[in-house]
Amino acid sequence: MVAATELFADRGFTGTTVDAIAVRARVNKAMINYHFAGKHGLYTAILRRDFGWALARLAEQRLEPMRADARLAQFVAVFGDLHQRRPGLSAMMLREAMSGGRHLDPTLLPHLRRIFEAVQSIVAQGVAEGTFRDVDPLFMHHTVVGCLAFFFAARPLRDRMISEGVVQTAALDPKRFIAHVQELLARGLAKE
């Protein structure tokens, strides 16, 4: 799955072939087709695994009583951790979003809905507690998921710009970026 994720991230769904995946993974093409029923099955399995991992962490989070601001910080941490564990996922999802979800298996839509519902629930809790100002949950979802996905997907370009001296900074620590997003959201949502 690692080789396929790298190729889907780099070339997109359409630009990736089972032959290329087999070569990169050093496996027989027939094995991929047998285990995943082809390229689309493998693509779906990757996304199902990663969405499932995130949803399991969010379900654990819901069991703990905590304020909405802490819950939102944990949501950001879960997705930051996911993008660090699965480096190609960010680019895969951005490509999928740009294609209008053309290659997204319909069985994955409930996973995406549950991720959005987690944000919606956090926003509603924060407004009810009086700790968050009233914001659109869909905007909040795109703010959180979008900035994390872009940060991790843009790493190759960012690294190139740093190595070529275009940007004068050291490589950016993902944990610092996640903390930065958490702080921005906490301050930006705080009820005045």
Where is each model-derived feature located?
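Hydrophobic alpha-helical connector segments
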Residues: 59-91, 137-144, 175-178
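C-terminal peripheral helix-coil segments that are non-catalytic and often amphipathic
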Residues: 78-81, 85, 113-133, 147-192
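Helix-turn-helix
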Residues: 3, 7-41, 45-46
